[in-house]
């Protein structure tokens, strides 16, 4: 396993060096290598940076995202993938690095040192971990990029990701699709309205976002986030609360096809889907009746994590299901309690 060290100053940091894992490129199969060799243009149109954040529990699902992204995206571009983490198993990293190839590079970036100054202020609940906050570090860590995509690891890419990247953000900070998890339940709609002070129809899901990194730096977004994090703790939708509050009025609303969840008023046909996002407890590795699960398993079968992922599904118990139900009920109760607070965010601070 070959490792390189990149000075943090080159990435906008002032700490010691950060380790970025970049093994030699691996061949994922003769047919795919031949396709890339013969089908991909030699002169690429540009580079598309894509960021992920994960821990050991979710890393196997990243393989599905990468597999589907590679299969469905234009090879007219180079893709640079960065996996932000705070301690991923070496064997897991090695498996993911087998997707590393010409025009499709992957680097693991440990953000542990970056996390320390704000760690005590982060609030995590049930299945959330601190990885959900990693996306706020991207603009400061990677000054070489003015624009980038961020994606959660529980996604399946069915459209050309280059099309998403080329949306014109203008002066907007973020491009995101409406959050179907919020708009499918009245208590969450009320929460966004009364606690965040936002229109739930325009509340975006942060699991697939197009980021204007140049504007983030110019507006000192990280400093604004760190300040708000110390002043108020959003406990329900957490990092998405912060992002939506801080980016309000500067969000490009993307078609929901780019972040379609299993919940929502209707189902999109395969030809209309671009990215499927298995939000909240709607996980195909836990349940066998999740909408769009066929796309998840289609790509899961092609990965080296398939046995592990299918074992999670097969070993899911009634106790796990009851735990999910209890978690859903608890979250709704928490949302209602936040709505009822006399010192809720919007009641105290008003419009950001």
Please name every model-derived segment:
Residues 1-35, 39-48, 54, 61-64, ...:
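A glycosyltransferase accessory/donor-loop signature
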Residues 80-87, 176-177:
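Short internal beta-strands
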Residues 49-52, 69, 80-82:
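Hydrophobic targeting segments
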Residues 59-74:
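Histidine-anchored nucleotide/phosphate-binding helix
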Residues 148:
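Short aromatic/hydrophobic "clamp" motif used to bind/position activated sugar donors
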Residues 100-138:
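Active-site-proximal specificity loops/subdomain of glycosyltransferases
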Residues 158-187:
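Conserved donor-nucleotide/metal-binding helix-loop-beta segment in metal-dependent transferases, i.e.
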Residues 152-156:
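The conserved acidic donor/metal-binding loop of glycosyltransferases
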């Amino acid at each position: 396993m070959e490792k390189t060290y990149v000075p943090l100053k080159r990435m906008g940091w002032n700490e010691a060096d950060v380790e970025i894992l970049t093994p030699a490129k691996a061949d994922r199969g003769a047919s795919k290598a031949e396709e890339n060799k013969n089908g991909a243009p030699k002169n690429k149109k540009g580079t598309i940076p894509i960021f992920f954040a994960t821990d050991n529990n979710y890393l196997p699902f990243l393989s599905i995202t990468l597999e589907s992204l590679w299969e469905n995206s234009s090879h007219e571009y180079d893709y640079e993938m960065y996996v932000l983490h705070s301690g991923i198993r070496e064997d897991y990293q090695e498996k993911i690095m087998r997707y590393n190839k010409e025009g499709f590079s992957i680097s693991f970036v440990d953000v542990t040192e970056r996390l320390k100054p704000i760690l005590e202020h982060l609030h995590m609940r049930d299945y959330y971990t601190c990885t959900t906050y990693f996306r706020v570090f991207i603009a400061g860590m990677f000054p070489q990029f003015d624009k980038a995509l961020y994606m959660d690891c529980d996604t399946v890419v069915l459209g050309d990701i280059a099309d998403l990247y080329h949306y014109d953000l203008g002066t907007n900070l973020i491009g995101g699709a409406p959050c179907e998890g919020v708009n499918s339940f009245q208590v969450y709609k009320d929460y966004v309205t009364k606690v965040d002070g936002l229109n739930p129809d325009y509340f975006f899901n942060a699991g697939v976002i197009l980021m204007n990194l140049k504007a983030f730096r110019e507006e000192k977004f990280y400093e604004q986030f760190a300040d708000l994090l110390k002043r108020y703790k959003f406990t329900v939708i957490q990092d998405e609360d912060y992002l939506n509050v801080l980016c309000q009025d500067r969000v490009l609303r993307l078609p929901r096809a780019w972040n379609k969840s299993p919940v929502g008023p209707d189902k999109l046909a395969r030809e209309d889907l671009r990215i499927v996002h298995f939000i909240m407890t709607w996980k195909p590795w836990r349940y066998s009746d999740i909408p769009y699960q066929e796309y998840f398993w289609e790509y899961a079968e092609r990965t080296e994590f398939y046995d592990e992922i299918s074992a999670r599904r097969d070993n899911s118990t009634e106790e796990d299901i009851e735990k999910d139900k209890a978690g859903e009920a608890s979250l709704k109760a928490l949302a209602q309690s936040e709505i009822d607070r006399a010192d809720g965010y919007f009641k105290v601070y008003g419009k950001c």
